[in-house]
């Protein structure tokens, strides 16, 4: 820790989002905040392939992906590889608690997205989040 700042445990993020504007905004916000966006994909097969390739600290996934893809399949792949997933979606699926660390409901702004990632990181480390943005539900450590 240097000057009160913790080293981030979440550095490399995969974005699975089929809405181009949302995907672009998320990618831009994360990069500006110092995260490495491993990839931005819009389909289940592309997300699963990236997850299987390793070196991802967090997946941000919409539930509805292109070609009728289901983000819950992305969540299952992430879970199988030990990678936490945060759903970023308009409606949190009923089975989300079994698949993900949490849900951030759309619409959300860049500050809320970054605060949600910080809250996920705190939760994974066993700490209480400093701030929970509106629309964020966390399933571990609730």
For each feature predicted by the language model, list its residue ranges.
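Non-catalytic signal-transmission and effector/linker regions of two-component phosphorelay proteins
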Residues: 1-12, 45, 97, 110-142
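Active-site residues of response regulator receiver
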Residues: 62-63
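Short amphipathic alpha-helix used as the core "switch/output" element in two-component signaling
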Residues: 69-83, 92
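Conserved acidic carboxylate
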Residues: 17
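Two-component/phosphorelay signaling modules centered on CheY-like receiver
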Residues: 20-39
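Acidic, metal-coordinating helix/loop segments flanking the phosphotransfer/catalytic sites
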Residues: 27, 40-58
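A Lys-centered signature of the CheY-like receiver
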Residues: 106
């Amino acid at each position: 820790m240097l000057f009160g700042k913790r080293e981030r445990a979440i550095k490399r993020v995969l974005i699975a989002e089929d809405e181009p504007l949302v995907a672009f905004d998320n990618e831009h916000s994360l990069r500006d905040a110092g995260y490495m966006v491993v990839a931005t994909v819009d389909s289940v097969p592309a997300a699963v392939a990236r997850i299987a390739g390793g070196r991802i600290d967090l997946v941000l996934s919409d539930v509805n992906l292109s070609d009728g893809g289901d983000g819950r399949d992305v969540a299952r792949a992430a879970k199988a590889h030990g990678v936490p997933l945060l759903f970023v979606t308009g409606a949190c699926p009923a089975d989300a608690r079994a698949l993900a660390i949490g849900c951030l409901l759309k619409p959300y702004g860049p500050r809320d997205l970054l605060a949600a990632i910080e809250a996920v990181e705190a939760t994974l480390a066993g700490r209480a989040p400093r701030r929970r943005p509106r629309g964020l539900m966390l399933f571990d450590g609730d």
